[in-house]
């Protein structure tokens, strides 16, 4: 259940029912329900995976409406209404303090479901799932290419801002840019993009921004520093990286809010409504959707064809060119797995759903990618050939770079930091950094120290 634009107001369609439920509960029970909703919301602030599909979202929404209508739904206090789990797929995820919330009402949510009937008539669940994967693949490859360009631009060869043996690691600029754009596309304007196309918002936030940023590369750079005995640089690398990424998303949210305010001043309310309604009828029309899907599929085929051709030409010579084209070929599976794992965000552990505030999907994706990258780095050190270096680096940059993400992680971190339980943000960050670094040390650093690899 989503609140209206004014956080303190309730949706008309169920406001009286929610107030009646709220007044009928004891204070302790009300507080527990509020904490449960907040825990689930912050955990789903970045991504909810394939639960965003219309079929699963519609069933969740229908069951929620039924429970509220019967007076059995989870009550929500008037003073602390938070977006529900269902809302994450169709509304902007924002800090819970109210600084950046742009939720939509239940009436708008129902209208949004009605506007999608044309798409649902022609898209079976399997075709819908394939459509999401096509969007994720296309935007995931674009994210890899953008990350490569930023790495080269700020790296030693051009601007010289970042390097391999510095706390300003090579992927820092892409993590900052991705976190900044997450504030725009994944928080403030997420609801607006959803009203244009649900596939587009997932393609941009999960596909593009999730692949533009990478946690596994960040963790591996810190492991390389620790192997060389630069422990102070290692600690500072994690600290400064988190500080810059977290403030990048804050800067993104605030600038996006300013831009939204400017648009509101420039456009009248009536013209804004007309614009929104026309956009809903546009891309959510099934013919338009299928046309865009075919176009994306063709462009994806072109990208894969070019990548395969270039890889064949440059593989024997090695170098960053061959590694990039291999990365483009293996990037989509990394995005798909991360999107699949995101379904476990907000679920908690066990049947009781304990620790719902921990995004276990994102946590699993980041830690597993970091461990696999560390293992491949160990193999690369042991084999030490040009062919192995091309294969390992390409897989690390493409598949593992897309499997892990900083933009989603930092969106969850920011939501926790803005919630009532600020400590959860730092506990989540410590959990991610600690487990990834310790496991990476066992897989990579220890073998390097024992065998004396260069």
Task: State where each predicted segment sits.
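Membrane-interface helix-loop junctions in multi-pass transporters/channels
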Residues: 2-454
């Amino acid at each position: 259940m989503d609140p209206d634009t004014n956080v303190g107001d309730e949706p008309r369609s169920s406001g009286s029912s929610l107030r009646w439920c709220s007044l009928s509960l004891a204070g302790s029970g009300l507080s527990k329900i509020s904490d449960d909703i907040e825990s689930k919301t912050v955990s789903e602030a970045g991504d909810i995976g394939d639960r965003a599909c219309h079929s699963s979202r519609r069933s969740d929404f229908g069951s929620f409406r039924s429970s509220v209508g019967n007076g059995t739904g989870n009550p929500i206090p008037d003073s602390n209404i938070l977006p529900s789990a269902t809302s994450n797929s169709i509304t902007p995820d924002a800090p819970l303090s109210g600084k950046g919330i742009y939720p939509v009402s239940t009436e708008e949510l129902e209208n949004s479901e009605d506007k999608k009937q044309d798409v649902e008539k022609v898209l079976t669940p399997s075709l819908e799932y394939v459509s999401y994967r096509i969007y994720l693949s296309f935007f995931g490859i674009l994210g890899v290419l953008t990350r490569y360009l930023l790495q080269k631009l700020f790296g030693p060869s051009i601007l010289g801002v970042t390097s391999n043996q510095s706390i300003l690691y090579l992927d820092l600029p892409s993590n900052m840019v991705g976190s900044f754009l997450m504030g725009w596309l994944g928080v403030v304007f997420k609801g607006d993009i959803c009203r244009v196309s649900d596939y587009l918002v997932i393609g941009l936030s999960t596909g593009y921004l999730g692949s533009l940023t990478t946690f596994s590369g960040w963790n591996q750079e810190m492991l390389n520093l620790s192997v060389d005995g630069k422990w102070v640089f290692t600690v500072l690398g994690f600290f400064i990286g988190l500080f810059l990424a977290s403030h990048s998303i804050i800067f993104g949210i605030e600038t996006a809010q300013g831009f939204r305010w400017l648009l509101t001043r420039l456009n009248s309310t009536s013209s804004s409504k007309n614009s929104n309604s026309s956009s809903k009828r546009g891309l959510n029309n099934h013919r338009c959707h299928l046309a865009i899907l075919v176009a994306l599929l063709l462009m994806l085929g072109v990208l894969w064809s070019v990548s395969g051709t270039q890889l064949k030409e440059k593989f024997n010579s090695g170098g960053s060119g061959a590694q990039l084209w291999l990365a483009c070929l293996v990037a989509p599976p990394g995005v798909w797995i991360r999107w699949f794992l995101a379904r476990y965000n907000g679920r908690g552990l066990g049947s009781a759903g304990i620790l719902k505030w921990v995004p276990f999907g994102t946590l699993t994706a980041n830690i597993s990618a970091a461990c696999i990258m560390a293992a491949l780095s160990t193999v690369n050190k042991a084999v030490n050939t040009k062919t192995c270096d091309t294969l390992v680096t390409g897989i690390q940059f493409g598949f593992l770079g897309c499997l892990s993400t900083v933009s989603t992680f930092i969106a969850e971190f920011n939501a926790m930091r803005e919630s009532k339980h600020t400590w959860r943000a730092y506990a989540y960050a410590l959990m991610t950094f600690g487990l990834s670094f310790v496991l990476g040390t066992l897989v990579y650093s220890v073998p390097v120290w024992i065998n004396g690899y260069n």
